[in-house]
């Protein structure tokens, strides 16, 4: 069933969807890792593909930037296309000195400055957390694949450009492992609609020391994260 944002048939999607923010990355993942894949959405250039990874049917769809966009697409995928498991595979910023560029970080929970989860939760704070089984599984697989991961709390913000040094110090104080713009919203939708969700990110920017990956470096720095996510859903 089509929605205003996803022009697809009911059975076009797998029950498992991996979601990068960038539609170009969705295309890259499909072309590099999936066999017999087809494009199942291009509305608003939010590209989606369904194919097979080691005989497992999997869909890849971009969710755009920010909680409103990510919440909209995850909600429609769950309600209209019967998606049961979502993995965000994105990028994040780091504030801790021990977290470096290209490190893979897994969000077990996410605080936020967004109002979205409070709107959902009758103006109260909502504990936006990942699915425990998905965390346990992906950590186990990371050890088998010898891929180093770090696990902790994220901070999901509506403001990409924010030079508030006081807030930066608070993030450090509370041991925030990654800063992004989507995770808390995705976890909120998943909890409300009773599906599984996990956010796994590669550090593309270090907020404290101002280091960042170039556009070219980003093209080749995310494969470990992508392969880990794919292996975790087999």
From Swiss-Prot:
Reactions listed under catalytic activity: a purine D-ribonucleoside + phosphate = a purine nucleobase + alpha-D-ribose 1-phosphate; a purine 2'-deoxy-D-ribonucleoside + phosphate = a purine nucleobase + 2-deoxy-alpha-D-ribose 1-phosphate
Residues that coordinate or bind a purine D-ribonucleoside: 5, 180-182, 204-205
Class of enzymatic activity (EC top level): transferase
UniProt-annotated catalytic positions: 205
Subunit architecture: Homohexamer; trimer of homodimers.
NCBIfam families: deoD, PRK05819.1
Name under which the protein is recorded: Purine nucleoside phosphorylase DeoD-type
Organism annotation: Buchnera aphidicola subsp. Acyrthosiphon pisum (strain 5A)
């Amino acid at each position: 069933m089509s929605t205003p944002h996803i022009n697809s048939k009911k059975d076009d999607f797998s029950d498992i969807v991996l979601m990068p923010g960038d539609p170009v990355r969705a295309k890259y993942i499909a072309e590099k890792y999936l066999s017999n894949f087809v494009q199942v959405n291009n509305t608003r250039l939010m590209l989606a593909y369904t194919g097979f990874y080691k005989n497992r049917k999997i869909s890849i769809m971009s969710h755009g930037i920010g909680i409103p966009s990510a919440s909209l697409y995850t909600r429609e995928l769950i309600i209209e296309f019967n998606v049961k498991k979502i993995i965000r595979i994105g990028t994040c910023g780091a504030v801790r000195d021990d977290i470096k560029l290209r490190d893979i970080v897994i969000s077990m929970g996410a605080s936020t400055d967004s109002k979205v989860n409070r709107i959902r939760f009758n103006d109260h704070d909502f504990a936006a957390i990942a699915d425990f089984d998905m965390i346990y599984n992906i950590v186990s697989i990371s050890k088998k694949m010898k891929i180093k991961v770090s696990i902790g709390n994220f901070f999901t913000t509506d403001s990409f450009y924010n030079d508030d040094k006081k807030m930066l110090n608070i993030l450090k104080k509370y041991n925030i492992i990654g800063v992004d713009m989507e995770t808390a919203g995705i976890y909120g939708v998943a909890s409300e609609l009773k599906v599984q969700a996990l956010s796994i990110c590669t550090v593309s920017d270090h907020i404290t020391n101002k280091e960042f990956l170039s556009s070219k470096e980003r093209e080749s720095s995310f494969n470990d994260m992508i392969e880990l996510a794919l292996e975790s859903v087999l």
